[in-house]
Amino acid sequence: MGRTTKVGSAGRFGPRYGLKIRRRVAAVEAKMKQKHICPVCGRKAVRRISTGIWQCQKCGATFAGGAYLPVTPAGKVAKRVTASKA
């Protein structure tokens, strides 16, 4: 319940907020709910526990990341800068 063909999981909002925003919410939620690559073991087994907290189902590594994705664009830049300084 709460799903539609056009907007998937954002169907819970019904006709509210407009189609464009509901499609954007559905896209973000789809990316968030898929499995991501673990930075420790490299397996595609990272799931979101709560806002900004991610855990690997394989090795059990828990780490902080973005609210909707484990690695944010700003985090990638920061990692690249610190790696180049070292």
Swiss-Prot record:
Listed cofactors: Zn(2+)
Pfam families: Ribosomal_L37ae
Record key words, sorted: Metal-binding, Ribonucleoprotein, Ribosomal protein, RNA-binding, Zinc, Zinc-finger
Gene Ontology BP term (one): translation
Cofactor binding mode and count: Binds 1 zinc ion per subunit.
Zinc finger (C4-type) residue numbers: 38-59
InterPro entries in the record: Ribosomal_eL37/eL43, Ribosomal_eL43, Ribosomal_protein_eL43, Ribosomal_zn-bd
Cellular component annotations (GO), alphabetically ordered: ribonucleoprotein complex; ribosome
HAMAP family assigned: Ribosomal_eL43 (MF_00327)
Family, per entry: Belongs to the eukaryotic ribosomal protein eL43 family.
Name of this protein: Large ribosomal subunit protein eL43
Organism: Thermococcus onnurineus (strain NA1)
